[in-house]
Curated annotation (Swiss-Prot):
Localization, UniProt: Cytoplasm
Domain PDZ intervals: 870-955
Region span, Disordered: 507-534
Upper lineage: Eukaryota, Fungi, Dikarya, Ascomycota, Taphrinomycotina
Any GO BP annotation: proteolysis involved in protein catabolic process
Protein name: PDZ domain-containing protein C1685.05
GO terms of molecular function: serine-type endopeptidase activity
């Protein structure tokens, strides 16, 4: 089948100019008959023609004039729709879209569009008329199968536009009629495409197995070349009536596909009469086969003759294509059965020749029994008594949101696509906590905590019995795979609000019901498998000291655009209190969940300390076989022998004796968007490494093992934006001072905050320094000093300013550092003894001249945020230090920290309005200087009106946007620690106290 795509997403394409086809003037042609039928000419008058030597052409001037009048009238009914799918649901993903609709009843305010526009899930949409007047529209009906649905608007809200309505005329659709498709094609507000209706019996287009697909209906086809944004456009004849609804198009040709309006008219009449729109189904997909195809599978020729005699226009019959697994009908019908007729209590035997004749009866017989007659090849004519199911009951209308995941009952759409039976499991539309990656979807949860979850209600019953952070087994099945899979998930009830949403079609909105709070957590110390101990000198002691650390970020913040699982190896550095040190790449941000996996147990971790190099994690308890290793604050030298001990993902200890290749300053490129990176850090490279998650480096001194470095991962970003990882050793000289500082009371820790000069250092060779003016005497001094230290003689020089907006420094790019407070500096570690000073006296080489300057030192600026606010779907937090590395020097940032947009969630009001990696500098004309200013502003801000936001990028360019809050689906929340140090999401309510979820 030719691949096709929905006209749902805008994509710009080139549209060739329209050239009207030549119309012959033969008096008996269909074209002339159509023109006469439309009343353009009096039959008694001569038919106007233009004579030439070879041909005669119909004068189309008056036809164009009529199309002009038609278009002038109908464009007042057509609206451009812009909206957002607020949550992933069924076959639809969260995100913004544009489409088309048209008014079919201006008194009730009804707009017709496609089902994939109206959407089965929650959406927020606005419609714009031709005069750019905008109104709110609310979805009130979407067909469970066919690609149409209705919006409703308030007619009294239209102030300046004279709305007309377009009548629906399915009977006017005929092969060969001229049509116009008017809509928001390619997002261009109003496009008019011309074509000729070519086919009325095309199979429903196939948009792909994971997407919404229509079935059990014919489609119309014409070469109109519609594209994204034209979904929901009316297919108009010359009288201005809609003969079909534009739905999709081909990727490889100009073919467009239109939905017939037979069932649309019925649904519209039900809405107008305020009666339920019943939809019946046999949970079976039918296809229309021609009589020749039917004869090849055994349909008797005499029966074909009878069918053609009864219905001369018939070209074939309906055939069973597939039946939903484990349904009642699956026990009766089989693929290949040919539908002949049916009989009901209120109908005589009626022959089935097309989809309309079938569903005219099924839609009226919901919950009742029909007698279906079929012809089965090799078996002959058979009769079955079948109960008509309610199609609405197999289409989900509610969902659960918990831990960032969206779950609902398995729909008929997906069950049909993958040949699953209904109630096979709870469908995951967005995974959240269930897979630690909110983008993953398309799997069924079949069991949770060892209990079956065939439906959403069963899943909720299990979930409410679980505690926050509980670790439970989950069985699931990925759609498209043949086997069930198994994993262990962590329940998250603290980072996200947990609610059940139910669709309310009367209001066109959704009702929200909060889930009961989780069961209280009970901390139990797990039993540990006893293992023989040989003291701290044994390799087993080292293995027991290594811990796998897993970190999950619930939101993309601080420049980290992925919420994937971060993992690495940490080292137990203190038994009492329990402390584990891990490198910063494993725990990139403060707002996260941490899980520690020891050799025989696992536990939740609590972040105690985070700086530019390491993270210190605590936990409630350690395994009883944990011991204190011997850590030494000493720098290795090039050529030193050492041993690398590391863990693989299976907690197996790997060791390798090796030699130090080099000791150098790590250099990393600035990333986009700005995020933490290792700077001003001296690292150790080894001759031989191991494929591992991390570990430690030790050296043997007699019978003792001295731990001298942590084996870490340094993540770089190349010019193409791709991350790659390099392993280095980080000296314990960076780690042990942090541990000593953590032993101090909180009040004393503030007096021992490390300071920085606000520049990035790197090495330069002596040859390069000599070119810049370094004297021979200085070169000799560097050479001799480096020999003493066992390093390569390379002075430090400034390669960039890290925070020019915050730290005014007397150092310039290219300055070579020679001395600090009278001490020669030959390596970066020589600066450690000055990191608590407020200023230093330095001798530098600048422009070939040695000079003495005073360098002010500043407290290190945080590289992470310890709290954040979710506002209209934007994750907002104080600016982290990496942003200031990539700011124009003359940018005037309000306030000392600024309010920074870390990320935008899909489907939120902020999507396509606010920009990630921008500052919010004003809201409704009020300047925002600090995070606290922003927080207090939100407590006073109403949530039912548009908000004007002024934002600024790192180049200082500003823009103003208007965003409308959505307190139902996107309430304002603050993410911070509670009094016990645990993460908690608090719902901010205007002029009321916070309520912790």
């Amino acid at each position: 089948m030719t691949p096709v795509s929905s006209d749902y997403r805008p994509n710009h394409i080139f549209l060739p100019k329209f050239r009207p086809d030549k119309i012959t003037s033969e008096c008996n042609t269909p074209q002339q008959q159509n023109v006469i039928a439309e009343g353009l000419y009096n039959v008694s008058e001569p038919f106007p023609i233009r004579n030439t030597d070879e041909e005669r052409y119909l004068d189309t001037k008056e036809i164009h004039h009529t199309w002009d009048n038609t278009i002038k009238n109908v464009v007042r009914s057509i609206v451009s729709i812009k909206g957002s799918a607020l949550r992933s649901f069924d076959t639809e993903s969260a995100g913004s879209f544009c489409a088309t609709g048209f008014v079919v009843n201006k008194t009730l305010g009804l707009i017709l569009s496609n089902r994939h526009v109206v959407s089965p899930g929650p959406i927020s949409a606005r419609a714009s008329f031709i005069n750019y007047e905008e109104i709110d529209i609310y979805p009130i009906y979407r067909d469970p199968v066919h690609d149409f649905g209705f919006f409703r608007y308030d007619p009294s809200s239209i102030r300046f536009h004279d709305v007309t309505e377009i009548s629906l005329s399915p009977e006017s659709a005929k092969v060969g009629i001229d049509i116009r498709i008017i809509g928001n094609d390619a997002g261009e507000k109003l496009s008019i495409l011309s074509s000729t209706l070519a086919r009325l019996d095309r199979p429903a287009p196939n948009y792909g197995i994971d997407n919404y697909n229509d079935f059990n209906t014919f489609y119309y086809q014409a070469a109109s070349g519609t594209s994204g944004g034209s979904s929901g456009s009316p297919v108009l004849d010359i009288s201005g009536a809609a003969v079909a609804l534009n739905s999709g198009g081909s990727n490889s040709s100009a073919s467009s596909f239109y939905l017939p309006l037979d069932r649309v008219v019925r649904a519209l009449r039900c809405i107008e009469n305020n009666t339920p729109i019943t939809r019946g189904t046999l949970l079976t997909e039918f296809l229309h086969w021609s009589y020749d195809e039917l004869s090849r599978i055994g349909l008797p020729r005499e029966f074909e003759y009878d069918c053609r005699t009864r219905v001369p226009s018939s070209t074939g019959l309906l055939v069973v294509s597939r039946v939903l697994r484990n349904s009642e009908v699956s026990k009766a019908l089989e693929p290949g059965d040919i539908l002949i007729a049916f009989k009901t209590d209120s109908h005589k035997s009626t022959y089935i020749v097309d989809f309309v004749s079938l569903f005219e009866v099924l839609d009226e017989m919901v919950g009742k029994t029909i007698e279906l007659h079929v012809y089965r090849p090799k078996r002959g004519f058979l009769t079955f008594q079948l109960t008509v199911q309610d199609l609405h009951n197999v289409t989900p209308s509610r969902f659960l949101e918990v831990g960032g995941a969206v779950l609902h009952d398995l729909s008929y759409q997906l069950a049909r696509s993958y040949q699953f039976s209904l109630n096979s499991g709870t469908y995951v539309a967005s995974s959240g906590m269930l897979n630690w990656s909110s983008g993953t979807r398309d799997f069924l949860v079949t069991r949770l905590a060892n209990k079956p979850t065939p439906t959403l209600d069963a899943f909720i019953d299990v979930l409410v019995q679980l505690t926050d952070n509980a670790r439970v087994p989950m069985h699931f099945r990925v759609l498209g795979k043949y086997e069930e899979e198994f994993t262990i998930v962590t329940v998250d009830r603290h980072f996200f609000l947990a609610s059940i949403f139910s669709r309310n079609d009367e209001k066109g909105t959704w009702d929200r019901q909060s889930l009961p709070p989780p069961q209280p957590s009970i901390s139990r110390r797990p039993s540990v498998i006893p293992r023989p101990q040989e003291g701290s000198k044994s390799m087993e002691a080292i293995q027991n000291a290594l811990v796998l650390v897993h970190c999950r970020m619930p939101y993309s913040i601080n420049g980290f655009s992925s919420t994937k699982l971060y993992s690495g190896t940490g080292v137990i550095v203190s038994v009492v209190p329990p402390l584990i040190v891990v490198d910063r790449s494993v725990i990139p941000v403060d707002i996260c969940d941490i899980r520690l996996t020891f050799q025989s147990m696992s536990a939740m971790g609590h972040l105690t300390f985070l700086d530019n190099r390491i993270a210190v994690v605590s936990c409630d308890y350690l395994p009883s076989n944990s011991v204190q290793l011997n850590f030494v604050a000493d720098f290795l030298r090039t050529g030193d022998e050492c041993t690398l001990a590391a863990l693989d993902e299976d907690l197996q200890l790997l060791t390798k004796k090796t030699t130090v290749r080099s000791v150098s300053v790590v250099e990393t490129e600035r990333s986009s968007p700005p995020r933490f990176r290792y700077v001003n850090c001296e690292v150790i490279s080894l001759m031989d490494s191991l494929a591992s998650t991390g570990g430690l480096v030790f050296r043997e001194v007699g019978d003792d093992r001295e731990i001298v470095a942590l084996w870490i991962s340094v993540v770089h970003q190349d010019v193409g934006g791709k991350d790659y990882t390099t392993k280095y050793g980080l000296s314990m000289s960076y780690i042990l001072p942090v541990l000593e500082r953590l032993k101090l009371p909180p009040s004393a820790r503030a007096q021992h905050v490390p300071t920085t000069a606000g520049v990035e250092w790197s090495h330069i060779t002596l040859a390069g320094a000599s070119t810049l003016g370094l004297s021979q005497t200085r070169s000799s001094e560097f050479y001799m000093k480096s020999r003493e230290n066992g390093t390569i003689p390379r002075p430090l020089y400034v390669i960039s300013h890290l925070r020019p907006l915050l730290h005014k420094t007397s150092l310039g790019v290219g300055d070579i550092l020679l001395e600090v407070n009278g001490k020669m500096i030959t390596r970066l570690s020589d600066l450690h003894e000055f990191e608590t000073e407020s200023e230093i006296k330095a001798v530098i080489l600048r422009d070939g001249i040695e000079m003495e300057i005073t360098i002010p030192l500043y407290p290190e600026y945080p590289t992470f945020s310890s709290r954040a606010i979710c506002w209209m779907g934007a994750i907002i937090h104080p600016t982290h230090s990496s942003v200031f590395e990539q700011v124009e020097p003359d940018v005037d940032l309000p306030g000392p920290e600024g309010v920074y947009v870390g990320s935008i969630l899909y489907g939120s009001p902020a999507l396509n309005m606010l920009r990630a990696a921008h500052w919010i500098v004003a809201v409704d004309g009020h300047d925002i200087n600090t995070f606290d200013d922003f927080y207090h502003m939100l407590l006073e801000k109403p949530t039912d009106t548009f908000v004007q936001v002024k934002q600024m990028n790192r180049r200082g360019a500003t823009s103003i946007v208007s965003v409308r809050p959505d307190p139902l689906f996107w309430p304002t929340c603050i993410i911070e620690r509670d009094s016990n140090g645990r993460w908690c999401t608090k719902h901010l309510q205007r002029k009321t106290k916070e309520v912790c979820s």
